[in-house]
UniProtKB/Swiss-Prot annotation:
Primary role: Cell surface GPI-bound ligand for Eph receptors, a family of receptor tyrosine kinases which are crucial for migration, repulsion and adhesion during neuronal, vascular and epithelial development. Binds promiscuously Eph receptors residing on adjacent cells, leading to contact-dependent bidirectional signaling into neighboring cells. Plays an important role in angiogenesis and tumor neovascularization. The recruitment of VAV2, VAV3 and PI3-kinase p85 subunit by phosphorylated EPHA2 is critical for EFNA1-induced RAC1 GTPase activation and vascular endothelial cell migration and assembly.
Glycosylation, residue list: 26
Gene3D superfamilies: Cupredoxins - blue copper proteins
Keywords: Angiogenesis, Cell membrane, Disulfide bond, Glycoprotein, GPI-anchor, Lipoprotein, Membrane, Secreted, Signal, Tumor suppressor
UniProt modification remark: Undergoes proteolysis by a metalloprotease to give rise to a soluble monomeric form.
Gene Ontology biological-process annotations: angiogenesis; axon guidance; ephrin receptor signaling pathway; negative regulation of dendritic spine morphogenesis; regulation of peptidyl-tyrosine phosphorylation
A Pfam family hit: Ephrin
Maturation-removed propeptide residues: 183-205
GO cellular component: extracellular region; plasma membrane; side of membrane
Superkingdom field: Eukaryota
Source organism of the structure: Sus scrofa (Pig)
Protein name: Ephrin-A1
C-alpha cells in the first residue's frame, strides 16, 4: 500500500506548489490603464479571470460590461485586434448572475489531455485581449502573461570554459552510431590461408 501513496503525495505537492493569479477583467481595474499590464507565472500556475459583476440595479443592464476574451499573437495584441473567431478563449456574459461573478481559469501546463486545450512553454509570453459586447466602442483591455523559465545555475569555478564538449556529450547533436558488426576491415578465409601457408610448410619440412 505504501507504493500507492507515493504518486498521490507527489500530486499533492505539485498542487500545493502551484500559485493562482487573479485578474479583475473590467474597465475600472487601474492595472489595465497601463499599456504593459503583465502577469508572471510558472508552469502549473493558474490565471483566474474575474468577470464584471453587478449586485444591484444601479446600472442599467444595457450598460453592464460584457467581454469576449481572445488568446492572440503578439502583433494582434499590439493592435488589439483578433484575427479570427478561433482565437476566442472565453466570454464574460453574465454580469448580473445570482451566484456571483464568473471566474474563468487558465492552467499553464506543458501538456494537456484535451484536444482544444492550450499548451504553454517556459520562457514564452502569451497575450490576451478583449472586445466589448455591451457597446460598439473600441475599448481594449489586454494582458500579457509570461511563463518564467527554470532557474539556471552558473558553471562551477573549476570548470574550464574553453573545454569543448564532445558531440556524444551534447544531447542535441545527432551522433551516427554503427550498427551490426565492427566497421574495422576483416580478412577473408583465403587471405588467412595465404598468410598461414609458410608456417605450415615449415612445420612439415
Amino acid at each position: 500500500m505504501e507504493f500507492l501513496w507515493a504518486p498521490l503525495l507527489g500530486l499533492c505537492c505539485s498542487l500545493a506548489a502551484a500559485d493562482r493569479h487573479t485578474v479583475f477583467w473590467n474597465s475600472s481595474e487601474p492595472k489595465f490603464w497601463n499599456e504593459d499590464y503583465t502577469v508572471h507565472v510558472r508552469l502549473n500556475d493558474y490565471l483566474d479571470i474575474i468577470c464584471p459583476h453587478y449586485e444591484d440595479d444601479s446600472v442599467a443592464e444595457a450598460a453592464m460590461e460584457r467581454y469576449t476574451l481572445y488568446l492572440v499573437e503578439r502583433e494582434q495584441y499590439q493592435l488589439c485586434q483578433p484575427q479570427s473567431k478561433d482565437q476566442v478563449r472565453w466570454q464574460c456574459n453574465q454580469p448580473n448572475a445570482r451566484h456571483g461573478p464568473e471566474k474563468l481559469s487558465e492552467k499553464f501546463q506543458r501538456f494537456t489531455p484535451f484536444t482544444l486545450g492550450k499548451e504553454f512553454k517556459e520562457g514564452h509570453s502569451y497575450y490576451y485581449i478583449s472586445k466589448p459586447i455591451h457597446h460598439q466602442e473600441d475599448q481594449c483591455l489586454k494582458l500579457k502573461v509570461t511563463v518564467s523559465g527554470k532557474i539556471t545555475h552558473s558553471p562551477q569555478a573549476h570548470a574550464n570554459p574553453q573545454e569543448k564538449r564532445l558531440p556524444a556529450d551534447d544531447p542535441e547533436v545527432q551522433v551516427l552510431h554503427s550498427i551490426g558488426h565492427s566497421a574495422a576491415p576483416r580478412l577473408s578465409p583465403l587471405a588467412w590461408a595465404v598468410l598461414l601457408l609458410p608456417f605450415l610448410l615449415l612445420q612439415t619440412s
